[in-house]
Amino acid sequence: MKVLLGLLLGYSVLIHAYELPDLPRTQHPPKSELSYWCTYVPQCDFCWDCQDGICKNKITGSRFINSNHSIVNCRVFRDSKTQSCLYEISSKMPNHFNMECSHPRPYTGNEIFMKPWGGG
């Protein structure tokens, strides 16, 4: 019984150690969190550095795409109370994507339309 109680207590401490603070709605998430946000919704504009119609991924630095309608304006938000992460995605059909911050899952809405630089 003491072992079980110890495990449960340890687990709850571990969960609280990974809680993240609130993040108000923003189009510019902290640089330290870009890899998190861009992993799950890679077509958000804050994930790309675009110049002269060619876009370079800010995280990998190696994936280049043509600047086109597949890169969308996004705002992100995190609620520390519920530990939910929310994307507001502005495109022709705006939508919301909500997930548990600790159990993220990719959004693949319009990533299939991203065209690699060079037409490939």
Curated annotation (Swiss-Prot):
Similarity annotation: Belongs to the asfivirus MGF 110 family.
Keyword Signal: yes
Function: Plays a role in virus cell tropism, and may be required for efficient virus replication in macrophages.
Organism, scientific name: African swine fever virus (isolate Pig/Kenya/KEN-50/1950)
Domain of life: Viruses
Signal peptide range in chain numbering: 1-17
The protein's name in its UniProt record: Protein MGF 110-14L
Keywords, alphabetical: Signal
